[in-house]
Amino acid sequence: MLKRDCCCGCKSAEFCTCKNKKSCIPNNLYEKIRNVFGYEVFEKLNNLRPYFDDLHSSTYIGKLDDVWVQIRIPSDSKINYDNETKLVEKFKDYFYYKDGYIIKKWFPGVDLFKVKIDSGIKKAIFNCVKNFQNLNVDKIEKFDWFKYPIQDAEYKALVKKYSKEPLVLSHNNLKRQNILVNKYGFIKLVDFEYVALNNKYVDPVSLYLFLGIPKEDIIDFFKLDPSVFDDFVFLMRVYNEAMYLNDYSKNNSKSLSPFDSKSLYSNKDFLELNRFIVQKNHNNFDNKLNISKIEKFYFVPLCVYEDEDRTIWKWINSKQLSSFNNHQIKVLAKAMRTLHDSDVEFPEYILSKKINWYLDHMEIKTLLEDLKGNKRINEIIKWIKQIKPDANCHNNLNFNNIFFNSSDNLYIIDWSVAYRNNRYLDIAFLFENTQMTPELESLFWKSYGMICPKDFYKYRIIVHFTAYLYNKLLNTDFNAAKVNTKRINEIFEKLNIKD
C-alpha cells in the first residue's frame, strides 16, 4: 500500500479520519485529478485509496458522490490514448476521460486469474469478443505491427501477406487481468490502451495464447481457418516478445530475484479484518486439495471458510519473513518430513501433464534460444520423466505462505498447488524460492533426516523450468521468465553439465 504521513498521523489516506482528508491522498493524486478534470470533479470524490500499479499507470478506487469508481492515472507518456478515448466515449460507465486519465464506474467482478474458465464462462467470453469486434467506432487508427524493431523475415512476410485483409475493432491485449466476470457470469473487457483496428484473428488467438482456451473451440466458434490461426499465433508471440524487450525489460527498475520470478505462480492474497484470504487461481491443474484433509496437521492454521473461489484462514500474528534462523529451519524441516510421510490422500501427481501442456503451447524457437539448445531441453524433460512421486507435497513453499508466530509456532498456508510429488522437488522449491544459504540448507537436511542427493541440482533446474514455462505462457511476465532461464543456465554452467 502507498503510504504518506497525514495531519492526523494515520499514515495512509485509506484510514484517514481528519477533516482535511484530501490532502492525505498519496502520489499527488489531488493535484493530478484537479489539473485534468477540474476542481468541481475532484470535490465529488471521496474514500480514495491505492488499488493497483503497473508499468503504464496507477489505479485507485473511491466514490464519485455515492457511486464507487475506479480512477486510472497514466505514468507512461509514450502511450497514445486517442483510440481508447474514442472508444470509451461509447460506454456509459466511463464518466470522465482525458489524456489517459479515466474515472469509470466500478465493476463488481474479478479477473480470470480467480475463476475457472468453464464452458459457460468460455461461451460468454466468445460472445463478448465477437460483440466487441462488431462495434462501430469512428476514426479508430490501425494497429501498427512494426511499432517495435522486429527483423524476423517470417514475421515480415506474414504481416505483408495479411495486410489487405478486412479489419475489425480489436482489443489487442486480451489477457486474464483484462477480462472481468461478475457473479452472474457477465463478462466485461477492460484496459483499452492498445485498442485499434486489426485482423479478426488477433483477439481470438489471444484467448488461446493467454487464457489457455483450446484453439479448436475458438476456431469453431469464430469460424476461422486453422492455418491462418497458426500464422497469427506466430505473429502474436513475436510481437509480444518485442513489446516486452522494448517496454518492460528496459524500464523495469526492480531487480528480480528467483523468488520474485515465481511470486505470481501462486494465488493472490489479501487481508480483511482478522482474516487472511487466498483467492484461488483457477486452471486445469490447481486447487484440487480439499483443505479439510490437512486440518489435522499442527502447521496448518484454522480454515474459517472455503469455497470454489477462495480460502479464508484465521489471521496469524506474524511478521513477513525475509530469511530463516536456525531454529525456524529445524522446525520447518521436521514439518515437511511429517507432511511428506503422511498417509493423507493428496491429489494425484500431475507435473508431467502440466509440463506437456506448457510445451504444446510453447514456441519451440523461443524455448531453444532461452535454454541454449535442444540437448539441454531434452535433458530437463528426461529428468522430469524420471521423477517418482513419493510424498505429499506443498509444491510452492515461499516467504508468502510460511509464517512463525511470536511463540515460533509454524503455520503454512496456500495449498493451491499441493499434490503427490517427489519430496526432493518440494524441498528444491523451498530452497530456490527463499534463496537459502548453503549453511541453512545443510542444517535443513540434517533436521529432515536425509542426506542431500548428489543429483539435487536436477530438482533445482526443474523448479525453474516449470516456473519459466508458466511465466512465458500464462503469466506473460517475460522478465520473470528471464530470471528463471538465467538461474537454469547458471546451474548447468556451474556444475559443468555437458549439453
From Swiss-Prot:
It comes from the Bacteria. This is Uncharacterized protein MHO_3780. It comes from Metamycoplasma hominis (strain ATCC 23114 / DSM 25592 / NBRC 14850 / NCTC 10111 / PG21) (Mycoplasma hominis).
